[in-house]
Amino acid sequence: MSVHSPNPGLILQSKRFNGLRNILEREGPFCKDGFAASSENLEFLQTKCQVLIIGAGGLGCELLKDLALMGFGNLHVIDMDTIELSNLNRQFLFRRTDIGASKAECAARFINARVPTCRVTPHFKKIQDFDESFYQQFHLVVCGLDSIVARRWINGMLLSMLRYEEDGTIDTSSIVPMIDGGTEGFKGNARVILPGFTACIECTLDLFPPQVNYPLCTIANTPRLPEHCIEYVKIIQWEKQNPFGVPLDGDDPQHIGWIYERALERSNEFNITGVTYRLVQGVVKHIIPAVASTNAAIAAACALEVFKLATSCYDSMANYLNFNDLDGIYTYTYEAEKSENCLACSNTPQPLPIEDPNTTTLEDVIKLLCDSPRFQLKSPALTTVMKDGKRRTLYMSGVKSIEEATRKNLTQSLGELGLHDGQQLTVTDATSPSAMTLQLKYQSNEVEMV
């Protein structure tokens, strides 16, 4: 009588989640109040819980791997980028043969082939390509982004999905928690955001450093830094000479070499030192230093918070983790507080202080909205309701015909435009899927209305 040996693959698969069963099927002294130990908890993770991962780069690859191996059976991943050679040292779900292909699709294909208990659905699109109904299907959203604009946009989307009871309280069933991770070199952070209850991205916007932009007049006429020389060659000389007949490719050594040589010539002309091949690569590609071990640590922290929120087995982090392993290991967790004046989650018009409406032009207001650490907008469009009840578009750059029609308003003062103290402006911008309301607050009482 022959005896068939058991399938080692099936045995391994049945034992894979024994560690999770120890957590989810029995209670302990650190369990969250109200946690019910049951086999249904693991079943929920494997069959019902849907998690959206935004970004399939260094953090995203780690998050996909972690969540797939933690029992999550239904993952979606969004990424609009394609794979570059420079990604391969840390984005381990990709191979050299994947260069030029979609990050989301390659990452999903790798996980689906390697982890049979998990199904990953890829979306090779921008997050802005999806509407509210798409995001409502998920129990949690976890972000591994390198863009502040994208963070602010998804933050605004999750806030716009909140529903309110008749007494003004939030319907908790409409909350989709967001777990956000970020890294730069040996530093990183992870945070838990419960929209409407905890501090959101906008509440702590001043924690993000403003993006460095070099004025065109400076890089063209009075360069002082090696970065100015590189930007000049990249923006002006490349466009004018088009040396290779194709768009600039930051991964092409010929392109980088050409920019390096021209930037070196310009730096010598203005007696500027410090132009190196590596610096040219960093400026051209906007490289943020990335260390694989930092990505792994932050992704693990994020994945743990996803697990705790999905199963309610332990209290989630409250709510911001700092991580630094530059000199040893340093971590610190604190509770970021909601801002009463938050542009996104306060639900009240926010004051926009104006020193003198007779000298402050609309262009000054737009510059304030773009440069202020509080706002950090990209290309705001402004509309308002005038005294006669008619809605008026003050300025909108996104539509050519409207931009041309409203361009003359830029040089007019707020008084000349007929905007009074306390008037509300509706502002839309690429940083948010929904409009924000600002209320003009004049410091000067005398306004000359034209």
From Swiss-Prot:
GO cellular component, one term: nucleus
A single GO BP: negative regulation of smoothened signaling pathway
Catalysed reactions, as listed in the record: ATP + [NEDD8 protein] + [E1 NEDD8-activating enzyme]-L-cysteine = AMP + diphosphate + [E1 NEDD8-activating enzyme]-S-[NEDD8 protein]-yl-L-cysteine
Keyword Ligase: yes
Alphabetical keyword list: ATP-binding, Ligase, Nucleotide-binding, Ubl conjugation pathway
Expressed in which tissues: Expressed in the wing disk.
Enzyme class: ligase
Pfam families: E2_bind, ThiF
EC number: 6.2.1.64
Active-site residues from the entry: C217
Lineage: superkingdom: Eukaryota
SUPFAM superfamilies reported in the protein's UniProt record: Activating enzymes of the ubiquitin-like proteins
GO terms, molecular function: ATP binding; NEDD8 activating enzyme activity
UniProt: ATP binding residues: 58-82
Pathway the protein acts in: Protein modification; protein neddylation
Function: Catalytic subunit of the dimeric Uba3-APP-BP1 E1 enzyme. E1 activates Nedd8 by first adenylating its C-terminal glycine residue with ATP, thereafter linking this residue to the side chain of the catalytic cysteine, yielding a Nedd8-Uba3 thioester and free AMP. E1 finally transfers Nedd8 to the catalytic cysteine of UbcE2M. Required for Cul1 and Cul3 neddylation. Negatively regulates full-length ci stability and hedgehog signaling.
Family, per entry: Belongs to the ubiquitin-activating E1 family. UBA3 subfamily.
Subunit structure: Heterodimer of Uba3 and APP-BP1. Interacts with Nedd8 and UbcE2M.
Name of the featured protein: Nedd8-activating enzyme E1 catalytic subunit
Organism: Drosophila melanogaster
